[in-house]
Amino acid sequence: MTKSRSSKTSRRNFLKLALGASAFGPFFLFPDRAAASQKTLKIAKWAHFLPEFDQWFVNVVAKDWGTQNDTKVTVDIVPVEEVRERAFTEAKASKGHDIFIFPWPPAEFYRQAIEHDEVYDMVAGKYGAIQQLAFRSTINAKTKTHFAFADFYMPTPLHFFQDYWAEVGMPLGPVHYFSLRGGGRELRKKLGVSSGLAFSSTLEGNITLHTILYAFRAWLLDARGNVLFSKNAFAVTALKYIQALYQESGSPEQLTWSSGGNIRAMLARKTSSSTNAISLLRTAEKRDPELAAKIRLQPPLLGTHQMGVTALPHVTNCSLIWKFAQNQAGAKQFLADLIDSSRTGYEQSKGCNFPIYPKTVPDLILRLQKDPQADPPYKYVELQDALHWTPNLGVPGFASPAYMEIFNSSLVPKMVARMLKGEQSAEDAAASGAAEMQRIVDKWN
């Protein structure tokens, strides 16, 4: 009898406590259950060349979005040289992050990616239709859908030391590939300073060599994705140019540089010029302003055979949502909302991240004309037409799975290395390179 009354009293007290607590919300009684019910969003992102940008992305963009959307957002920063391997590991396991952000078009993973057309549609209402660079970098020609979402790119201008080039009568720097070769040859003879173009199997080496081939009309694949390389004289001509440039003005280090090697060489004044995203110059401005004042920018070198001024993007920032993502809806919304921070992203990247959607940074040209860190302030105005001279990886076609495998496997740097080391002639290197390209194309067809 006593036990029964005691039991009823305890139960009654518990109900009173529970009812009273309910006025303060459901998290009061069950904190573990509340935390478990919170949505999560997992992001893997390539490591930006300027670490402060990633700090802002993690501590401001991701954190604020998570707070506003009741979502726990985690961001893992992945070194550029490890991005492809990490992505393959996740794709194979069908497990990992919700969003994977690449510094290039992730066409190789289109089968594991959702269709991103909806994300582009979400952005279109505020910032306009998808831009050409984004379209050609993320469209799958077979499925007619987008395998990723592109929001910014990094142009690849020429960086050169004005005082060095003034020594050979070119204070404004070389304007085409033949003045780069001639001036570079004289500079090495006179000052012992070599050309600083990257030829190694790195991101910058790939971009540099793919750009030279494209500028010489030595296209790897045609607009339909068929192998075109070595089917005309352009390929051998381009390779012979690279060979002459290396022999007359280069150095053995160009073939062995690790990621960022060309930047380190420039900052040490060991080279006279290099092609790179402006992270090179921004790094110089931060570490040694006097050194940075001697570095000038130039639009890409003028190509041959009416190719004009052109250079492939050093980075095409592409975000991919996996089919196995646990929070696809949140991932789509995050990417659509990310565009709203493009203006601040441009500032946090010190101008490295050029907007694919012009409306997001409408005063871009004014910013380039008067940069607060540049000496002189108008130094960056050379980039005002960057969107016009920056085609997509894969041009004249799209960034196809085959092209991106050719790119990411460093087929071109390896082909060039065999020639520069004397293992193959330019003709044999072109032929063997074309055969490797054909094997990759056949694999994807």
Per-region residue spans from a language model:
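Extracytoplasmic/periplasmic solute-binding protein
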Residues: 143-151, 156, 180-228, 234, ...
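Glycine-centered hinge/linker elements that transmit conformational signals in sensory
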Residues: 183-186, 225-256, 300
